[in-house]
Amino acid sequence: MSAVTPEQAWEVFQQADCLFAESQVESALDNMAVAIRRQLADANPVAVCLMNGGVVPFGKLLTRLQFPLQVDYVHATRYGARIKGGELEWIAGPFVPARDRTVLLVDDILDEGTTLAAIEARYRADGAKRVFKAVLTRKVRPRKVAIDVDFVGLDIPDRYVFGYGMDYKGYLRNAPGIYAVAAVHES
């Protein structure tokens, strides 16, 4: 990853295209929560945050899921501080046993699908009864792996995006909406 200063990150934010305002993202999270409750309210699921990007959508969803569940997290990444994916690196988790349990994986974005598919495979290998996948955003693009998600907040164009958990070179995960990086800053 090329180093970026806070000032450069702020410039990226100021020049970005707002794809979805905060109110639109919150509405999408409301809709996701309703769908998740319908499917999983009686399943005693383990809700799993996929770090780091999943932390914002996970936290926002969690308080909307008014039913018994356990919380866990995993940190497995193909990106680290890079903008292009590499080999999958397992950093932490899972911690709550998944055998014979329903698992809900929550992430910020479905891009190529490789990371989410690998995490799903790990939970299936660990004996999960069912694995559901929820993503705040799904890029409209071909995937490197065949993967379907059960709950999607928003479909987004195939651009470099940030906000609501997604980052620009380690910054801007906290942006109050979903933004696309201007072409001048994409490298």
Region annotations inferred by a language model:
Residues 1-187:
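PRPP-associated nucleotide enzymes
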